[in-house]
Every structure is written in C-alpha cells, then in structure tokens.
C-alpha cells in the first residue's frame, strides 16, 4: 500500500494526548523538507534505470547505465546541498545586540535589569533631563480570574533619580512577554512619584536607622567620606539614583523580595530627621565629637524656636547616645569572628605566654616616636633617652612614676 509523504512523517512526529501532557511533544523531531536536498530516483552518479528514471528502449538489454557528466555538472551537483544550507542560514533575522562596556552592564549578562535606561519622558511640561533610571526587577506575575482563568502579566520595578536627593520608584505592568512595555510604563509612573531625601553633607544619611517591610529588615549606617557603597546590589542602584555615596546597609530576612527591600529602605530614608529638626524637637544642642579633633565637642545644631533645656530639666531619655536614639532599640546581628582551630592547642598557648611580656612594645614604640621623645628606634637612642630621664628624676626635675610595685618613699619613724 502506497503512503504519501505527510502520512509517513506523521508516524514519526505524532504524539498522543497523554504524551503531550507529559512533555513528549518537545522531544519529537520536526519535519525535514527532503525534497529540497534529494530527489527520489536520482543520485550524484546519474544512474539511469530503464523504466524508473529513464525511458525503455527496445534494443537496449542493459537495465542500468551511468550517464557521462562534465566537471561543471559534477561540481554543481555536489555543491547544491551546501548552497541550500547557506541560503537557509542567511535568511534568518539575527538580533543585533549592542556591545556594552563592562561598567554599563546590568546585574546579569546583557539583561536590562540593572542597566542605565536614561531620563524619563517629560510630564506636563516638566523635563527630567538630569535624571537617570534603573530597572531593578522584571518578573512574570499571575492572577486567577473567574472569566479568563489564570492571567499572566509582566511586572517591572523601576527607580529614577537625579543624584541630588530627588528620586521616585514604581511598578509598571504589561501583558505577558511585553517586557519593554512594562519598563516604559514603570518609568512613566516613577516620574510622577518623586520624593525628596535629606542628605548629610550631600553624600550620606543623617543617622543610623532601622526599617522593615514584610520579612525584609534593613539596618542602614552612615559612613565617613570615601567609604563607598557597601550594601545590596539593588540598594546600590537606589543610592546612585538618590545621590548617596557613603553608606553601609545590612539586610536581614528576605533578600529576594526587591519591592519590599526598596520600600523598607525608602521608608527609612524619608523618616529620618536633620540635626536642626532633632535640636528643635528635643530642645538640646546636637554635638559632634570627632577623633580628628581629639573628641572635643563641636556644636552642629542648636534649638531656635524651642527653649533650651537645662541640667535640671533633662530626663533619662534625653541622655541617650545618637546611635541608641534611633533604630527602635534594634541592632544588626554582629557575629564574633570564629577562633582558629589551633587557638586552644598547647603549643599556641605557650607561644602566646612567651610573647606576653612584649604585648605593649609596639604601641609604646609608636607613641615615643610620635611624641618626638626618641628620634629613632635603636638601642643607642633608647639608652640615651633612658639615661636623660634617669638624671632628671634623680635631680628632682621629674617626679618618680608610681605604679604597680612602686609606692611613696616614707621615712622611717625614729623610736
């Protein structure tokens, strides 16, 4: 029984209904157009069979003959298949992807997530030329409806800012497989939800704060100039959009819920208060004690419209340190550094005991050289300094130091 080509291919490519549910449909090979590459009854050698691909002759008794071919015909026949394959490859449309600089790439490869997307479009005549936009997340969401069943959509979390305290974030949505549309909708919504963040010295936050959203907990700490951004990769993009340059943020709990992470961090930024606002609310001076000034107090802000409190009117809550004043009494988990395996071995303990008498020698050396008491840390210089100090003590110029094992010289009473 003769069968057609489509019927023969169906025996190789067909899958039952139960097999389609189990994923066997993707394992079947597609239909190959064999007629483009090979014609049944022909071969590269041009073999002729009487009655099949050649006419039958009365006086010809040979059933098979090989036709003579020129070199050009042989070359064209051998290169025909190669030419068809090349035409098939060149017919496909290839996506021309622009090669990005390594510093301009996103969080993963060539994806848009984490890349700079430019300024938002103008809204009601307001331009955002100095703004920069980042896409923090693109994901597929689903919603079960009673009419259409499970409806899938694309969701994009976008943040935009000018790097000087103005920023905004929003979630844009679009139909399934419309990632670009979701990002564009998110950019337009973020440009309509602009908020302002107060920055200390234009680079960091005013005080350490704690914020949470769902199962995401954020501990933000201010840092000195030049520290940089040490935080979650998504928070780095948010800080760049806002203009924060020096900060340390510890994230506990869920670190993959980027919307909750963004909301918690922005909430903590908006709830902080400046030094002047703190001075007005508490009626006290805000004082900074920096090691660069040997911890001498320097007044940063003073109350203007509020009466200044005195020592008698101070309460116990007013005597808190600035680090303990904020944060709702919560502190980030700081695990102690794990001890090495040899910390309690006998040999290591003996070595520490032998080094114990010299434990302060390095700090003493630095102090003596810094105070210009010893010009160089050599034996001759130290001996000369010790001899000079001994002479001053013997002559009474300097008092004799009193410490452990030393006491006042008390004359013995005469009986």
Swiss-Prot record:
Belongs to the universal ribosomal protein uS5 family. GO terms for molecular function: RNA binding; structural constituent of ribosome. GO terms for biological process: translation. Coiled coil: none annotated. The keyword Ribonucleoprotein applies. Component of the mitochondrial ribosome small subunit (28S) which comprises a 12S rRNA and about 30 distinct proteins. InterPro entries: Ribosomal_Su5_D2-typ_SF (IPR020568), Ribosomal_uS5 (IPR000851), Ribosomal_uS5_C (IPR005324), Ribosomal_uS5_N (IPR013810), Ribosomal_uS5_N_CS (IPR018192), Ribosomal_uS5m_N (IPR048584), Ribsml_uS5_D2-typ_fold_subgr (IPR014721). PANTHER family: MITOCHONDRIAL RIBOSOMAL PROTEIN S5 (PTHR48277:SF1). This is Small ribosomal subunit protein uS5m. Transmembrane segments: none annotated. Residues 1-31, 396-415 are annotated as: Disordered. GO terms for cellular component: mitochondrial small ribosomal subunit. Keywords: Mitochondrion, Ribonucleoprotein, Ribosomal protein. Residues 131-197 form the S5 DRBM domain. Pfam families: Ribosomal_S5, Ribosomal_S5_C, Ribosomal_uS5m_N.
């Amino acid at each position: 029984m003769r069968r057609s080509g489509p019927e023969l291919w169906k025996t190789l490519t067909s899958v039952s209904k139960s097999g389609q549910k189990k994923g066997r449909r993707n394992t079947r090979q597609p239909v190959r157009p064999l007629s483009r590459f090979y014609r049944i009854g022909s071969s590269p050698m041009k073999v002729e069979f009487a009655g099949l691909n050649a006419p039958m002759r009365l006086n010809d008794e040979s059933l098979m003959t090989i036709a003579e071919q020129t070199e050009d015909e042989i070359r064209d026949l051998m290169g025909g298949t190669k030419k068809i394959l090349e035409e098939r490859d060149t017919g496909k449309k290839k996506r021309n992807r622009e090669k990005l600089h390594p510093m301009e790439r996103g969080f993963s490869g060539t994806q848009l997530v984490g890349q700079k997307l430019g300024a938002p479009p103008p809204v009601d005549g307001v331009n955002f030329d100095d703004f920069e936009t980042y896409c923090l997340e693109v994901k597929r969401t689903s919603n079960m409806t009673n009419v259409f069943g499970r409806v899938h959509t694309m969701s994009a979390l976008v943040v935009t800012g000018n790097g000087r305290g103005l920023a905004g974030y929003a979630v844009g949505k679009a139909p399934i497989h419309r990632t670009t549309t979701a990002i564009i909708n998110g950019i337009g919504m973020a440009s309509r939800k602009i908020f302002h963040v107060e920055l200390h010295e234009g680079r960091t936050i005013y005080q350490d704060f704690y914020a949470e959203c769902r199962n995401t907990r954020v501990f933000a700490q201010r840092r000195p100039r030049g520290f940089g951004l040490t935080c979650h990769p998504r928070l780095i993009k948010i800080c760049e959009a806002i203009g924060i340059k020096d900060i340390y943020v510890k994230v506990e709990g869920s670190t993959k819920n980027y919307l909750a992470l963004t909301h918690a961090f922005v909430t903590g930024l908006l709830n902080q208060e400046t030094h002047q606002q703190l001075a007005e609310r508490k009626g006290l001076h805000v004082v900074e004690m920096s090691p660069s000034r040997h911890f001498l107090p320097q007044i940063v802000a003073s109350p203007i419209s509020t009466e200044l409190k005195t020592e008698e009117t101070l309460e116990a809550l007013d005597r808190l340190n600035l680090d303990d004043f904020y944060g709702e009494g919560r502190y980030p988990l700081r695990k102690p550094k794990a001890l090495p395996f040899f910390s309690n071995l006998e040999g290591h303990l003996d070595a520490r005991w032998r080094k114990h008498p010299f434990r302060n020698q390095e700090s003493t050396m630095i102090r003596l050289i810094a105070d210009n008491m010893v010009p160089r840390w050599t034996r001759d210089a130290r001996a000369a300094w010790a001899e000079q100090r001994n002479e001053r003590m013997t002559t009474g110029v300097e008092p004799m130091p009193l410490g452990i094992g030393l006491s006042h010289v008390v004359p013995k009473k005469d009986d």
